[in-house]
Structures are given as structure tokens and as C-alpha cells.
């Protein structure tokens, strides 16, 4: 099970976080700071897996963003890397070659895509087509709602 997912920049700025365990905010901030520091201090040629406390950290850098998942010790690291890659593929499919600015200015869409893909720390939808279709359907509903509200105001 995935305990949490963090997306952060090379400068250490947190761009997205999703927690699948309950922790107080103070503890989350402490953990986030510690993990960002650990990963950013590692060399580029080192392993993408880090034993951390009773969990394993699995991370991958895409352009200027690090995608990091904390998983249980018995979970498969390579499968987790594939989950990270699938999330990046979904972001790319939606945004068209996603970049850090897409995450910053459209964070709600990035969270929505993540929620379509992973729920409760487990993979919910493995099909990219189905996940992207759900996101596009949501966009269409939002657009229709906005148009009908605008028409109602006239």
C-alpha cells in the first residue's frame, strides 16, 4: 500500500502531496521536509529506492520534478516505479507533455487525475484510456455547468 505521494521540485518546493494515512499536519510537514532533504541530497546515479524508517521510498525524477511514494517494506519497488510512470503518462496525456507549471497552475486537475488512478493507497484504474475519459467527462460537465450558469445570468 502507498502511504503517501509527494511531488517536489529540484529546489525542494512541494508541488503536490497525497496522504493515504492519517497524521497530524505538524508530523506531515516534518516527514515531507526530511524526505525532500534525503532525496535531493542523493546522487543522480544512485538507486531510486531508499529504506526509510519502517517504509521504503521509491522516487523518480521527471524533468524538474521528483515523484516520490512511500510504500510498505513488503511492497514491490519496481511496481511502484511503474505506478509513478503511469501517473506521469496520465498527466502527459491530459496536459500534453506536463511540466512543473502545469502542476502549479492546475493542481486541482493533477489531484483529480491522481484520485482517478489511486484511491486509498491502492491502484484504482489501470487503463489510461478509462482514467483520461473520466477526467475529460468531468471537464465537460464543468464546462456545461459554467455555460448554463452564464446563460442563466443573462
Curated annotation (Swiss-Prot):
Record-linked Pfam families: Clat_adaptor_s
GO cellular component labels: AP-1 adaptor complex; clathrin-coated pit; cytoplasmic vesicle membrane; cytosol; early endosome; Golgi membrane; intracellular membrane-bounded organelle; lysosomal membrane
Subcellular localization: Golgi apparatus; Cytoplasmic vesicle membrane; Membrane, Clathrin-coated pit
InterPro entries for the chain: AP1_sigma (IPR044733), AP_complex_ssu (IPR016635), AP_mu_sigma_su (IPR022775), Clathrin_sm-chain_CS (IPR000804), Longin-like_dom_sf (IPR011012)
Consequence of changing residue 4 to C: Risk factor for PSORS15; results in decreased protein levels
Membrane topology: Peripheral membrane protein
Keywords linked to the UniProt accession: Coated pit, Cytoplasmic vesicle, Disease variant, Golgi apparatus, Membrane, Protein transport, Transport
Tissue: Widely expressed.
GO biological process: intracellular protein transport; melanosome assembly; platelet dense granule organization; protein targeting; vesicle-mediated transport
Listed PROSITE patterns: CLAT_ADAPTOR_S
MF (Gene Ontology): clathrin adaptor activity
Disease: Psoriasis 15, pustular: A form of pustular psoriasis, a life-threatening disease defined by repeated flares of sudden onset consisting of diffuse erythematous skin eruption characterized by rapid coverage with pustules, high-grade fever, asthenia, marked leukocytosis, and elevated serum levels of C-reactive protein.
The protein's role, per its UniProt record: Subunit of clathrin-associated adaptor protein complex 1 that plays a role in protein sorting in the late-Golgi/trans-Golgi network (TGN) and/or endosomes. The AP complexes mediate both the recruitment of clathrin to membranes and the recognition of sorting signals within the cytosolic tails of transmembrane cargo molecules. Involved in TLR3 trafficking.
Oligomer status and interactors: Adaptor protein complex 1 (AP-1) is a heterotetramer composed of two large adaptins (gamma-type subunit AP1G1 and beta-type subunit AP1B1), a medium adaptin (mu-type subunit AP1M1 or AP1M2) and a small adaptin (sigma-type subunit AP1S1 or AP1S2 or AP1S3).
Similarity comment: family membership: Belongs to the adaptor complexes small subunit family.
Name used for this protein in its record: AP-1 complex subunit sigma-3
Protein source organism: Homo sapiens (Human)
Gene expressing this chain: AP1S3
Amino acid at each position: 500500500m502507498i502511504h503517501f505521494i509527494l511531488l517536489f521540485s529540484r529546489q525542494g518546493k512541494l508541488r503536490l502531496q497525497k496522504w493515504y494515512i492519517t497524521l497530524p499536519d505538524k508530523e506531515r510537514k516534518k516527514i515531507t521536509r526530511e524526505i525532500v532533504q534525503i532525496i535531493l541530497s542523493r546522487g543522480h546515479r544512485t538507486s531510486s529506492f531508499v529504506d526509510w524508517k519502517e517504509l521504503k521510498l521509491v522516487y523518480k525524477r521527471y524533468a524538474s520534478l521528483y515523484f516520490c511514494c512511500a510504500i510498505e517494506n513488503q511492497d514491490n519497488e519496481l511496481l511502484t516505479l511503474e505506478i509513478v510512470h503511469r501517473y506521469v503518462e496520465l498527466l502527459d496525456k491530459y496536459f500534453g507533455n506536463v511540466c512543473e507549471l502545469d502542476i502549479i497552475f492546475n493542481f486541482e486537475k493533477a489531484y483529480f487525475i491522481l484520485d482517478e488512478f489511486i484511491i486509498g493507497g491502492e491502484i484504482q484504474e489501470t487503463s489510461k484510456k478509462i482514467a483520461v475519459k473520466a477526467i475529460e467527462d468531468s471537464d465537460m460537465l464543468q464546462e456545461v455547468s459554467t455555460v448554463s450558469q452564464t446563460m442563466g445570468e443573462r
